[in-house]
Amino acid sequence: MVSARVVRRVSVLAAIVAILLGIPVQATAAPRPTSGVDDINCQPSAAHPRPVVLVHGTWSNPTKTWEKLAPALRDQGYCVYTISYGKRENASLQNLLDLFGGDSIRESARMLGKFVDTVRAETGAAQVDIVGHSQGAVVARQYMKFDGGTNPANPAANKVNTLVSLAGTNHGTSFNRNQFIGAVGEMLGIPVVRLAALAVGPSYVEQMIGSPFMTALNAGGDTQPGVRYVAVGTRDDNMVTPQERTFLTAGPGATVRNLWVQDGCPTAQVDHMQMTSDPRAVGIVLGALDPAWGRTHPAPCP
């Protein structure tokens, strides 16, 4: 049993390590409910029969991430549900800063699976749509591939109909040169990977280009049969680098639409974190979930 004193001391060390590694950690407040969101009494309508599950990214939380998009979806008549995931597990000596989205992506995907089953049971819906930001898109893809979110032998039994990936780290990222800096540290004998997991959890390293996790996730193709994918990137992304690594390639039985926020609006300036709140990005999500609505309601262009 590790004493609380040891955990506190190591947590201080973890915070120092995070700063030295250049990891952009921000304090995350406990999630607060948004009116009309996460309503167990919400009944999907004929117009929007699938609940929408929102999956935040690394070191964020539902309140911070979805303060604009969740109400916009609610106002369009969707049943909207948000998950918070990836905090430090009891007695674990990883993610000592206890950040949301820090835990292993495999564990977070299993948590998402349980959450989706709860949403389906509460609403009576056979399927959900998922919007995932950054790591959230990868958590969703892991769930769909390995944890029961889809049924390749019988796609009609899929639990997920549509995945909208917002700046997803789908093919790994260099984190704007942090991966290179970490590799140099490892060559110099500094255990950067272990220190990063200690400080902020394993998900950070799992999202890097060429990681064992990314290799396994993308082996055999990016998609699952019967799922509609919309991958939205931004040319201003400083977290998913190179930015094109967010896009997906359709495999058998799946459809993929890849687009930039700047498509049709080259003046749009939207960074990684703004992908869930910028009015144009929000409009793109609404149109992705309801293409018929999107054809008559183009996303605003500043």
Feature names for model-found ranges:
Residues 32, 38-41, 45-127, 181, ...:
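Active-site catalytic motif of lipid deacylating hydrolases and related acyltransferases
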Residues 200-238:
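The feature captures the conserved acid-bearing segment of alpha/beta-hydrolase catalytic domains
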Residues 186, 222-302:
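C-terminal catalytic-base region of ester-bond hydrolases, centering on the histidine
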Residues 56, 80, 98-100, 106-215:
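Serine-dependent carboxylesterase/thioesterase catalytic core
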Residues 57-61, 86-90, 133-138, 145-146, ...:
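Solvent-exposed loop/turn segments at secondary-structure junctions
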Residues 67, 92-95, 172-179, 241-245, ...:
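Short aromatic-enriched loop/helix-cap "lid" or pocket-rim segments at secondary-structure transitions
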Residues 44-48, 73-75, 122-123, 131-132, ...:
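Extracellular/periplasmic catalytic domains that process cell-envelope and extracellular macromolecules
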Residues 1-29:
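Secretory targeting and sorting signals
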